[in-house]
């Protein structure tokens, strides 16, 4: 990771740039400029059903209207591109394959209907829903491969270490924030349609682009524990 400040603003082109997004962009831009760092614009377009090129152009125009220039990103390039997630799919697949090989991820064959039934069963018992039941976590590689070869649809899930302990985040605003790793689900990193999830792609990109500081709203603080689940 670079010793100099590298921050990013990574909007999803599912609509126009809203006030909250503009605020986050300004904070990141100002932090980079104040510290002689690099401000990166990245387009997080992993939602294929809602992301459009038109919205991307609207966001770029809005950034310029705000007087924000970017050092790396669309139209200016950079050493860590491409800067659109749909152009980085091979990087996410390579990372997922490495996690599979290291035993840190596994294929999940559970259907949406099964997952919905688990939630409904918990509600019927008046118990809090504990998330994914990890029924595919302990399949042997041979069992999983046989189901893949049979054409059974599957997603990829991260294998959160069972003895991980607490996830501790040092936040510049809130100080030390602690999450109980036992409450962290074996979250999906690749959907059954072959596309990466937002949280997975974002973590991969931040690592590969050498991002030193993540400036975003409080509503995203809980996402940080997902990225640190194997640290």
Task: Please give the residue ranges for each predicted region.
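N-terminal Rossmann-like or analogous alpha/beta NTP/dinucleotide-binding catalytic cores
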Residues: 1-124, 193-195, 222-230
């Amino acid at each position: 990771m670079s010793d100099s400040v590298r921050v990013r603003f990574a909007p999803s082109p599912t609509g126009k740039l809203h006030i909250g997004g503009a605020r986050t962009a300004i904070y990141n831009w100002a932090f980079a400029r104040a510290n002689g760092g690099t401000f990166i614009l990245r387009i997080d377009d992993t939602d294929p059903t809602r992301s459009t090129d038109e919205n991307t152009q609207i966001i770029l125009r809005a950034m310029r209207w705000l007087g924000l220039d970017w050092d790396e990103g669309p139209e200016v390039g950079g050493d860590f591109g491409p800067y659109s997630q749909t152009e980085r799919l091979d990087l996410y697949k390579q990372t997922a394959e490495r996690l599979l090989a290291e035993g840190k991820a596994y294929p999940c064959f559970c259907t949406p209907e099964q997952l919905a039934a688990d939630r409904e069963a918990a509600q019927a018992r008046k118990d809090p829903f504990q998330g994914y039941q990890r029924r595919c976590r302990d399949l042997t590689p041979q069992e999983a491969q046989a189901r893949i070869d049979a054409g059974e649809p599957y997603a990829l899930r991260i294998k959160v270490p069972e003895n991980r302990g607490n996830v501790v985040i040092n936040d510049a605003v809130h100080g030390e924030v602690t999450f109980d790793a036992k409450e962290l689900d074996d979250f999906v990193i690749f959907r059954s349609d072959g596309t990466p999830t937002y949280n997975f792609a974002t973590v991969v990109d931040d690592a590969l682009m050498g991002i030193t500081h993540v400036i975003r709203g409080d509503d995203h603080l809980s996402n940080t524990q997902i990225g640190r689940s194997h640290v």
